[in-house]
């Protein structure tokens, strides 16, 4: 469960620092890849909500688990807490619906992403990120077809992204070893 909050916080940090919290500022060709649930989460965020997410994301190392992080969020904004819980429950239900092989793959991805989190004051190690992406791709390719199909059915927007030719070109150039 803690890993799901980290993913939500990561989404929050990325959205807070890269995307200016306005769906209208996202290029049209990328909007289709954003899950409706994520769009809905960010759709009506206030400036105060965005600031709360930034603040809590910057303190991620101080939270012992997901419940502690959610409690901190609840103390800052009950409305935002409710929205975060709704999004968390949506993600949890999707993961819990998977068969063991697919669930193990998703859990492994989440653990790998968590391991990439830099120490306080440190920057993300891009080479470690690239290697993690290569490892995940290799593990995905090694899955049997039934598991791949289950993942595609459960996470259709992710499938759209990874099968998009433009995305593949960008990812391939990013993942090339220096």
Swiss-Prot record:
PTM statement from Swiss-Prot or TrEMBL: N-glycosylated.
Cellular compartments per GO CC: extracellular region
Signal peptide: 1-16
Main localization (coarse): secreted
Keywords in alphabetical order: Coiled coil, Glycoprotein, Lipid-binding, Retinol-binding, Secreted, Signal, Vitamin A
Residue ranges of coiled coil: 67-89, 122-154
Pfam family, one: Gp-FAR-1
InterPro entries membership: Gp-FAR-1 (IPR008632)
Glycosylation sites: 44, 75, 157
An MF annotation (GO) of this entry: retinol binding
UniProt note on tissues of expression: Localized to the adult body wall, in particular to the lateral chords. Found in the epithelium of the uterus of adult females.
Compartments where located: Secreted
Keyword Cell division: no
UniProt record similarity statement: Belongs to the fatty-acid and retinol-binding protein (FARBP) family.
Function as written in the Swiss-Prot or TrEMBL entry: Binds retinol. Also binds the fluorescent fatty acids 11-((5-dimethylaminonaphthalene-1-sulfonyl)amino)undecanoic acid (DAUDA), dansyl-DL-alpha-aminocaprylic acid (DACA) and parinaric acid. Binds long chain fatty acids, with highest affinity for arachidonic acid, linoleic acid and oleic acid. These long chain fatty acids can act competitively to displace bound fluorescent fatty acids and retinol. May compete with host albumin for fatty acid-binding.
Full protein name: Fatty-acid and retinol-binding protein 1
Organism: Onchocerca volvulus
Gene name in the database record: far-1
């Amino acid at each position: 469960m803690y890993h799901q909050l980290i993913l939500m916080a990561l989404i929050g940090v990325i959205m807070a620092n890269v995307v200016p919290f306005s769906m209208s500022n996202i290029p049209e060709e990328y909007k289709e890849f954003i899950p409706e649930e994520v769009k809905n989460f960010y759709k009506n965020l206030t400036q105060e909500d965005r600031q709360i997410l930034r603040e809590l994301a910057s303190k991620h190392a101080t939270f012992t688990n997901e419940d502690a992080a959610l409690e901190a969020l609840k103390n800052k904004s009950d409305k935002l807490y409710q929205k975060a819980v709704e999004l968390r429950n949506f993600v949890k239900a999707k993961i819990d619906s998977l068969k063991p092989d697919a669930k193990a793959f998703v859990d492994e991805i989440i653990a790998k992403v968590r391991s990439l989190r830099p120490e306080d004051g440190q920057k993300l190690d891009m080479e470690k990120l690239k290697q993690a992406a290569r490892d995940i791709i290799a593990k995905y390719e090694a899955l049997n077809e039934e598991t791949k199909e289950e993942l595609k059915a459960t996470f259709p927007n992710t499938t759209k992204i990874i099968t998009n030719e433009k995305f593949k070109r960008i990812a391939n150039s990013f993942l090339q070893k220096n």
